[in-house]
């Protein structure tokens, strides 16, 4: 049973301008004990008002609604009653959908097609809602400052940066990449846990948000200074000498792409010339890989708890002794600029 606390079910607010879809989603959500649809809303303003009045555990939000769209609804909810928000979109390749994540929504999922198996889709969306209902939402990325460990003595200039992120990652990635100059002297490779089909849209949005060359990785892509390669859905991203490689190897820690293969391949190829970064996310993916980078002599960074949507992956790495410095997300770009000089 999926409970938000004690014996209370997870209460979901559904926001969508289509009455038909609202009814369908309400049935799908409530099909399993432990979930309850607290209310439905037809636009962003109504969703914000209901969130303030009803205090649901999680909100599902359509983006394109008349009068007040999903973007304004998300902005109001995050300002007035911060609540975990799952964005539902009909177009996973649309970069504009990721604007919702920059406003504070935590996750994004494609709406079911007309031919979708609603039983399977129901299991998927309920698993996301269950996950999000347990997240303590922050109003802004900038938060209380956590103590930072002193930077280790640097023996070599960093020539490649690898980054791993999960829940809340798109917003954190945007904050990091926005802080880097267009002539950043190292390539960057990223694994972001996200629903299948969304990585191309994520790359497009990050390209708009930053001054870097951000693209979805292809097998054999050269690693170039100022280029950011995002692992595509369903394939591991690993680094060869000067090139990106995609792999269909089995999932690692249930993930494909997984952060750990990226980090371990970077450590193997670049050793102390590689910097590993773990951002916000749930679970342990990437923690062991970050320790491999540290053991190879490369510097390692982690996003702090105050600015993380979920301090899980980074916490696991800290507990392993794999992290040199724990930083607020808006201080990570400066650290990367210093390490690549």
UniProtKB/Swiss-Prot annotation:
Phosphorylated by CheA. Phosphorylation of the N-terminal regulatory domain activates the methylesterase activity. PANTHER family: PROTEIN-GLUTAMATE METHYLESTERASE/PROTEIN-GLUTAMINE GLUTAMINASE, PROTEIN-GLUTAMATE METHYLESTERASE_PROTEIN-GLUTAMINE GLUTAMINASE. It comes from Anaeromyxobacter dehalogenans (strain 2CP-C). One of its GO terms (biological process) is chemotaxis. This is Protein-glutamate methylesterase/protein-glutamine glutaminase 2. Gene3D superfamilies: 3.40.50.2300, Methylesterase CheB, C-terminal domain. One of its GO terms (molecular function) is protein-glutamine glutaminase activity. HAMAP family: CheB_chemtxs. The modification 4-aspartylphosphate is found at residue 62. Keywords: Chemotaxis, Cytoplasm, Hydrolase, Phosphoprotein. InterPro entries: CheB-like (IPR008248), CheB_C (IPR035909), CheY-like_superfamily (IPR011006), Sig_transdc_resp-reg_Me-estase (IPR000673), Sig_transdc_resp-reg_receiver (IPR001789). It holds the Pfam family CheB_methylest. It is found in: Cytoplasm. Residues 152-341 form the CheB-type methylesterase domain. Its main location: cytoplasm. Contains a C-terminal catalytic domain, and an N-terminal region which modulates catalytic activity.
């Amino acid at each position: 049973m999926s409970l938000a606390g004690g014996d209370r079910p997870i209460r979901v607010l559904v926001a969508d301008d289509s009455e038909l879809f609202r009814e369908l989603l309400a049935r799908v959500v409530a099909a399993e004990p432990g979930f309850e649809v607290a209310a439905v809303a037809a636009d962003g303003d109504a969703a914000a008002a209901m969130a303030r009045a009803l205090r649901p555990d999680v909100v599902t939000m359509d983006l394109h609604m008349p009068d007040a769209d999903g973007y304004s609804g998300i902005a109001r909810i995050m300002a007035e009653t911060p609540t975990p928000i799952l964005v539902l979109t009909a177009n996973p390749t649309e970069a504009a959908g990721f604007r919702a994540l920059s406003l504070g929504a935590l996750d994004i999922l494609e709406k079911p097609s007309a031919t979708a198996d609603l039983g399977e889709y129901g299991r998927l969306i309920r698993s996301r809602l269950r996950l999000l209902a347990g997240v303590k939402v922050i109003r802004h990325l900038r938060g209380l400052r956590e103590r930072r460990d002193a930077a280790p003595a640097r023996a070599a200039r960093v020539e490649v940066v690898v980054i791993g992120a999960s829940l809340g990652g798109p917003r954190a990635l945007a904050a990091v990449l926005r802080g880097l100059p267009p002539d950043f002297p190292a390539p960057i490779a990223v694994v972001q846990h996200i629903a299948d089909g969304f990585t191309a849209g994520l790359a497009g949005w990050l390209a708009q948000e930053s001054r870097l060359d951000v693209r979805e990785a292809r097998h054999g892509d050269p690693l170039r200074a100022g280029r950011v390669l995002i692992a595509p859905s369903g394939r591991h991203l690993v680094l060869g000498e000067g090139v990106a490689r995609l792999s269909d190897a089995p999932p690692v820690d249930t993930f494909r792409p997984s952060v750990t293969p990226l980090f371990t391949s970077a450590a193997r190829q670049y050793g102390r010339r590689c910097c590993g970064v773990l951002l916000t996310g749930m679970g342990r993916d990437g923690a062991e890989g970050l320790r491999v980078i540290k053991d190879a002599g490369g510097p390692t960074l982690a996003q702090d708890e105050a600015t993380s949507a979920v301090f899980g992956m980074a916490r696991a790495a800290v507990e392993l002794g794999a992290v040199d410095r724990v930083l607020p997300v808006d201080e990570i770009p400066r650290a990367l600029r210093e390490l690549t000089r």
